[in-house]
From Swiss-Prot:
Residues 189-191 form a propeptide. It is linked to Takenouchi-Kosaki syndrome: An autosomal dominant syndrome characterized by macrothrombocytopenia, lymphedema, intellectual disability, developmental delay, and distinctive facial features. (Microbial infection) AMPylation at Tyr-32 and Thr-35 are mediated by bacterial enzymes in case of infection by H.somnus and V.parahaemolyticus, respectively. AMPylation occurs in the effector region and leads to inactivation of the GTPase activity by preventing the interaction with downstream effectors, thereby inhibiting actin assembly in infected cells. It is unclear whether some human enzyme mediates AMPylation; FICD has such ability in vitro but additional experiments remain to be done to confirm results in vivo. Phosphorylated by SRC in an EGF-dependent manner, this stimulates the binding of the Rho-GDP dissociation inhibitor RhoGDI. It comes from Homo sapiens (Human). The modification (Microbial infection) O-AMP-tyrosine is found at residue 32. This is Cell division control protein 42 homolog. The modification Phosphotyrosine is found at residue 64. A motif (Effector region) lies at residues 32-40. The lineage of its organism: Eukaryota, Metazoa, Chordata, Craniata, Vertebrata.
Amino acid sequence: MQTIKCVVVGDGAVGKTCLLISYTTNKFPSEYVPTVFDNYAVTVMIGGEPYTLGLFDTAGQEDYDRLRPLSYPQTDVFLVCFSVVSPSSFENVKEKWVPEITHHCPKTPFLLVGTQIDLRDDPSTIEKLAKNKQKPITPETAEKLARDLKAVKYVECSALTQKGLKNVFDEAILAALEPPEPKKSRRCVLL
């Protein structure tokens, strides 16, 4: 059975772990526990063939900047996450996350993933952002960034309501399997 390695990166507290737990167990975790490094595996059927989707969670906190890339070798696809209600996490996609993964894995495809879309219409969240003269990130803004950074595409979801959740992983699998160039050379290798 072929394995697809999918690594999830992004700022701390944008919902990377919730995304993975909600997808793999259909349950939403109730409390926030920062991740050091976890992985999950699910079997998915693609075109009648079973694949193991290996999902690797990483810590977004800066303390782990030297440790995190140890999970990058052999990655088939990255999910670069930001919260649609955290403009700073969106900014860090461009400033930190995409430079980091493209430095270590220049040929590995990645998707830009907007999380916490259930909060985009939440009055108290909107109010908090407005106090700092900020607004939630729109899909159009995120799609433009995805194009500028050469992401495979932009997808968004809510781990809480599961809206768009399965699509994120379906698109990740497609990105890992679609060969714009020979498959072997696209895996991340640290020398």
